Amino acid sequence: MDTAGIRLTPKEIVSKLNEYIVGQNDAKRKVAIALRNRYRRSLLDEESKQEISPKNILMIGPTGVGKTEIARRMAKVVGAPFIKVEATKFTELGYVGRDVESMVRDLVDVSVRLVKAQKKSLVQDEATAKANEKLVKLLVPSMKKKASQTNNPLESLFGGAIPNFGQNNEDEEEPPTEEIKTKRSEIKRQLEEGKLEKEKVRIKVEQDPGALGMLGTNQNQQMQEMMNQLMPKKKVEREVAVETARKILADSYADELIDQESANQEALELAEQMGIIFIDEIDKVATNNHNSGQDVSRQGVQRDILPILEGSVIQTKYGTVNTEHMLFIGAGAFHVSKPSDLIPELQGRFPIRVELDSLSVEDFVRILTEPKLSLIKQYEALLQTEEVTVNFTDEAITRLAEIAYQVNQDTDNIGARRLHTILEKMLEDLSFEAPSMPNAVVDITPQYVDDKLKSISTNKDLSAFIL
């Protein structure tokens, strides 16, 4: 697995995070150092490696200030498997719900997909060539071979012919005639020139087995995996366009070309050494003394999470995985509870703590304009597909930021997420009418913003409905 990103210096990591996330420099520095320490550890001898564990991080800050985005972007920068889980989804072992080990199994699933996607990319040309060969045969088929008659020893018992399931001539063809060879040569040329992309072709694809709905979540998943391994793969015939068929066939051939067992082992190692698990809403399982009944359950979840953070061997469908060197990032607003309300053992497993700042009007302005694909650029690009040009003035952007900030102050503070719904509300009419406005140019001014959002910015009851 290519993990060249792990060799980035902390400054380079922060620089890459700055392309997508505004502010929160302290949090960016801490995650950058954590990533660099992983690279430093990889350079040590085996004995030293085993002694050094990642320093888990606890992010403290209100919703919508960038906690999840920092962790997700960090994982993308280094090509590490990453999952986000919510602590409130877990229950104590023995109760209905997800057990804490499921987050490790989910991480391994992500790791397997990452490794296999990279390995498939290395054989993509060969797989596509095989897919094109198959498409030529499907578009110009030969005569099918007749099913061979084989003696079945059970025939005499049942008084008739018994189909021999060991012989499968379904896909066997007679040798192509000269006429078919000529036609295939012409079809191959047209395929290479892209002239047949929209033509329909019938292919056989593996059918997804139905889910078992009568069991609990984890039981369901484990039983489903067991049944999938025992049951033969069922194929169904579908009629699709050539371009779609090529993707399906190439993906199937790529699966055959890579060493599945080697990929699984590489994925397990990647999850162990580079995996990042983001545990959101960890403050919701912190205990206080106001409700002893709930506190018992919350403490149970914390104590179940603790062994995973300390290092446990978890069984997955790909093999065992050790969590000792995975990086865990806990996050929560901690409005009601405090980090000290977590059980002491769990507090000790998050030695690095960082408080994220609430967002100001200036931060909102930067969020709207600075990131690589900022919200303003996204909406401009979307409307440009309808040949509608939208120009936001600087004053209009500032006015949008002021309204978003004010609504956050007057109602629930949901941080930068407020900008999404404010923008969506403001551009609702334009988005609806855009298909009938070709070549239109629309200037978004402070007056335009006020006209569209006046009722929201002045009516607290109404602004409560703008999430």
Swiss-Prot record:
The gene is hslU. Keywords: ATP-binding, Chaperone, Cytoplasm, Nucleotide-binding. Belongs to the ClpX chaperone family. HslU subfamily. One of its GO terms (cellular component) is HslUV protease complex. The keyword Chaperone applies. CDD domains: RecA-like_HslU (cd19498). Residues 149-192 are annotated as: Disordered. It holds the Pfam family ClpB_D2-small. It comes from the Bacteria. This is ATP-dependent protease ATPase subunit HslU. It is found in: Cytoplasm. ATPase subunit of a proteasome-like degradation complex; this subunit has chaperone activity. The binding of ATP and its subsequent hydrolysis by HslU are essential for unfolding of protein substrates subsequently hydrolyzed by HslV. HslU recognizes the N-terminal part of its protein substrates and unfolds these before they are guided to HslV for hydrolysis.
